[in-house]
Amino acid sequence: MRVLVVLPFPPLVEGGAASRCAIGMLRGLAGHGVELQVLAAHLRNDMLEGPKGDLPDDLPIELAPVAHPRSKQTRWLRFAKPSSVLERTPFVQLVRERARDADVVHFVELSAATLIHLVDRPAVTQVHCLTRRDRAIGPPWTSEGRVAIELLRAERRIFKQSRWLLVNSREVADPLAKIAPHAHVTVAPLPLDPAIYTPRAPLDAPVAGLIGTAEWPPTANAIERLLKSVWPRVLERRPDARLLLAGFGMEREAFPHLPDLPGVEWRGTVPSATDFLRELGVLLYPLGRGSGAKIKVLEALALGVPIVTTPDGAEGIGSYDGLVVDTDDAALADATVALLADAQARQAAGAAAYDTFCNHHAPLPATIPLIELYEQMAATGIRRPTAA
């Protein structure tokens, strides 16, 4: 089977979370014998500047540098047709040409799926989350409200155009089936490439931590809950406990309304998310609201790091082995204290977490539902009417 995968970003080994998931998926598809062609857009303002990182050299990835539209045009597109920037670039013609040789086309994320109407092959849109579950929809005169409304409009437009939709959790699939009743919705676990996460975390240090992008609403609400409620309870039982916080924008100044607490170290942006996670003995992620599988949780599993989180934090995970999942802040704190205090318990939980990764989120098992979806799509023989 010939599959064209369209990415709106370069799948870099040390790129963002979406890049690492894309690599895991591509390795799984290749392992199942799929004849892959990968077309990745690299939107940039400076056309002389290459991607900041390395592409996997053993995967058939065609990187397409495209100039970012002018800021005035981008602002207009955000109003007129959100998430459609790639439609105003030469990437459009590349997608059309490469799709001619494919049995199935797989668009990753909304910003790529904006091109779904341009191909005449069975095509699937992959989405990781739903805006209404991730953030409050504020008034349009606020920046947060405008962003949320733009995302909702993009979702509505692209879901309407998609006959097949791919998600990573039942919690996203069920509401999506109501939003897009005409579409076939498939759930497949998110995979990661285990080679990126070797060696595993030693778990020697009794240190808790969390990594994420500070401005992303689910991360922001987890940090607020962590520092207002969970970490103070940990300190009551273990005054010498340490908490490491890292990620883009993860600076003390970004959260001026939160208390200063002992043992908290703000790392900010780190060179390698994987290396940061290897420092931890526990991933502590008290997420209150957020949809889809969380990459930081998957990465902790792949590294064999025990996880203490909520049901939303564990969404899309194939098994709870190696995780403590609870909604109560006191219970989350108790579980964290127990793991910090007992090296053997950390090792046992870490081994169980790694087994969960291998059984459910390694490339081959995680992509089995995707292979089945491709076969179903190809068997229909349906060709979409394309835009002129």
Provide a role label for each language-model segment.
Residues 171, 188-191:
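Carbohydrate-associated surface elements
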Residues 21, 191-196, 202-260, 265-279:
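Conserved catalytic-core segment of nucleotide-activated headgroup transferases in glycan assembly
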Residues 17, 344-374:
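A charged, aromatic-enriched C-terminal amphipathic alpha-helix characteristic of glycosyltransferases
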Residues 296-302, 306-310:
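Short hydrophobic beta-strand element within catalytic cores of glycosyltransferases
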Residues 322-330, 338-344:
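Conserved acidic donor-binding segment of nucleotide-sugar-dependent glycosyltransferases
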Residues 92-97, 131, 145-165:
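Membrane-proximal helix-turn-helix segments that form the acceptor-binding/catalytic region
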Residues 118-136:
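Active-site proximal beta-strand in glycosyltransferases
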Residues 103, 163, 278-292, 303-306:
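Acidic donor-binding loop of glycosyltransferase active sites
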